[in-house]
Amino acid sequence: MPSDRRVALVTGANKGVGFAITRALCRLFSGDVLLTAQDEAQGQAAVQQLQAEGLSPRFHQLDITDLQSIRALRDFLRRAYGGLNVLVNNAVIAFKMEDTTPFHIQAEVTMKTNFDGTRDVCTELLPLMRPGGRVVNVSSMTCLRALKSCSPELQQKFRSETITEEELVGLMKKFVEDTKKGVHQTEGWPDTAYGVTKMGVTVLSRIQARHLSEHRGGDKILVNACCPGWVRTDMGGPNATKSPEEGAETPVYLALLPPDAEGPHGQFVMDKKVEQW
């Protein structure tokens, strides 16, 4: 029989902001905290580090680019808990500025993890969300810059209050195809694959929020995208202005919004404040 214990899950949780989010949830969330990572050894090492601090996370392997891996996690959650209370989608990749990998390959690889993988996790796990659940999709301030660098026509599409998930997926695919053809700039796209994937995650959050309000309005499940800020991680580099713990503050705030909270919902949140999209 599944336990009725509350459970929170963090993807990409073995280092950086994901690790800091997991540590904070272990301290503040009343229930089990699942630390997930693509690499089992790195994930177990992260769990041991938190155990040495007197915390008790559980580990489950998760590769968000592998549907079988996502479904194995989904089945585990169903069996062990029968549901999910908090989902923090943090797993991400980014190419360094100096990376010489051709841009169209960077676009394809970044999209596969940051947008497609996050979307697949949501498709499989959102149906498990319990009433009062919280979904946090970790995005980035680069998505705002990327949006402002899009053509007016693309900006209008990404800001639409009625855009569907299918339309969003179509736009993300078009970006990758346009990079392969070498026409992404003339088609109105910015020159940042990472920024475009994070635009996708932010708009996906808006769509998910709308869908949950329409179909499960009484359950008060809140979904938001957020920016942790510029954080000293492998990705952010050593000169960034925030520690991982400071970067975790907004995602954790959204993950632990009180049960009676009406919002934020379907918003892009930075430093615990809603940013205009």
Curated annotation (Swiss-Prot):
Keywords on record: Cytoplasm, Lipid metabolism, NADP, Oxidoreductase, Phosphoprotein
Binding of glutathione, residues: 95-97, 106, 193-194
Binding site for NADP(+): 10-34, 63-64, 90, 194-198, 231-233
A single GO cellular-component term on record: cytoplasm
GO biological process, one term: xenobiotic metabolic process
Compartment(s) where it occurs, according to its Swiss-Prot or TrEMBL record: Cytoplasm
Name by which UniProt lists this protein: Carbonyl reductase [NADPH] 1
Organism: Oryctolagus cuniculus
Gene that specifies this protein: CBR1
